[in-house]
Amino acid sequence: MISRLACIPVALFALSGCAIHQNVKPVERFDSKVVCIVDNPSVRATFFDAYERALTNKGYEVKKLASGASLVECPVTSTYTATWRWDLAMYMAYADIVVYKNAKPAGKATYDASRGGGNMGKFIGAEKKITELVDQLFPRLAGS
């Protein structure tokens, strides 16, 4: 009986290693309908495309800035990074989107499946996950 009870914490600990974490601090309302995104050439181009599409669908106009551009080039600027891994198939293991208003942090979305282990949820399509993050990061339509 005691050995069975001892197995419970071990099982819970093992399962916690298969966790996918997502944390979003949404942006507050701002008047600008333009979001400038600083290009990150070390990330797959499909990430930028999905991010741009998700913002456009919410009514924002997207302006692409060159890699290394200053955060003060636009009133609302965003940076991003992401990594992919292989585990039976390619999947987006990590994504981080930061939004700045007047060069100060205004919102952030982080998705981390790098410790997803046997969790099959990590195989969600990158575009679907990016859209979900953008919908949570920008809860309102542009200008509302």
Model-predicted regions and their roles:
Residues 19, 23-27, 62, 115-144:
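C-terminal/domain-edge helix-coil "capping" segments
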Residues 10-11, 107:
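N-terminal leader/targeting segments
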Residues 54-124, 128:
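Surface-exposed short loop/turn segments
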Residues 2-10, 16-64, 142-144:
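A structural "domain/chain start" motif
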